[in-house]
Amino acid sequence: MELYLDTANIDEIKEIASYGLVDGVTTNPSIIAKSGRNFREVIKEICSIVSGPVSAEVLSTKFDGMMKEALELVEIAENVVIKVPLIPEGLKTVVELTKRNIPTNVTLCFSSSQALLAAKAGATYISPFIGRVDDTSWDGMELISEIREIYDNYGYDTRILAASIRGPMHLKESALRGADCATMPHSAFLQLFKHPLTDIGLEKFLEDSKKLKW
């Protein structure tokens, strides 16, 4: 399973990348706006740190605008993936970008029928928002299962990128239900390392190590 960071914070990306555990990065306009920096400069710097896919979202909601922005974004680096919202104009853009062999990530997916449309359009990735689905009192993990079954039934190559991951349980369930990859904020990524028994065991090892001669 591939693990992505959902952030535009350069320090956070450098930290996790230094562990050799991050496969890519996802961004969106809201995340980049928090940095207060130029959109393209941020994407360029991220691509220089991470060799895997870096999702950069178009800002327009119209086909012509999305195509123009997408073609400009892919010139930044070869690992840029064009992120588009799951709207009719967005999927129209995905169809055209797919013809040009430009990878795409369809975002803001909240239903299996939406995921089916994205796959038919040729999306490289589909990003179901697990945490936000849970917030509506529906089961976000069931959405992953439904998408996995539909894609397997019809042989779609679109990869399931579980998004809105809020902690280890979300990641575990996404992995068990067949998501190909998952993206999460820096704070959630750090939670993956944590377990109380690990802390207890480490404390014991460190205590006993004081008795050893090196």
Curated annotation (Swiss-Prot):
Molecular-function annotations in GO: aldehyde-lyase activity; transaldolase activity
Where's the active site on this chain? K83 (schiff-base intermediate with substrate)
One GO BP annotation is:
pentose-phosphate shunt
EC nos: 2.2.1.2
Main location as per UniProt: cytoplasm
Q: Report the subcellular localization.
A: Cytoplasm
Top-rank taxon of the source lineage equals Bacteria
Q: Which UniProt keywords apply?
A: Cytoplasm, Pentose shunt, Schiff base, Transferase
Q: Which reaction does it catalyse?
A: D-sedoheptulose 7-phosphate + D-glyceraldehyde 3-phosphate = D-erythrose 4-phosphate + beta-D-fructose 6-phosphate
Name of the top EC class for this enzyme: transferase
What stretch or stretches form a coiled coil here? none
SUPFAM superfamilies for the chain: Aldolase
Any single Gene Ontology cellular-component annotation: cytoplasm
Kindly tell me the pathway this chain contributes to.
Answer: Carbohydrate degradation; pentose phosphate pathway; D-glyceraldehyde 3-phosphate and beta-D-fructose 6-phosphate from D-ribose 5-phosphate and D-xylulose 5-phosphate (non-oxidative stage): step 2/3
Record-linked Pfam families: TAL_FSA
**What is the documented function of this protein?**
Transaldolase is important for the balance of metabolites in the pentose-phosphate pathway.
Instruction: Indicate the family of this protein.
Output: Belongs to the transaldolase family. Type 3B subfamily.
**Name the record gives this protein:** Probable transaldolase
This chain's source organism reads Leptospira borgpetersenii serovar Hardjo-bovis (strain JB197)
Gene name, per UniProt, is tal
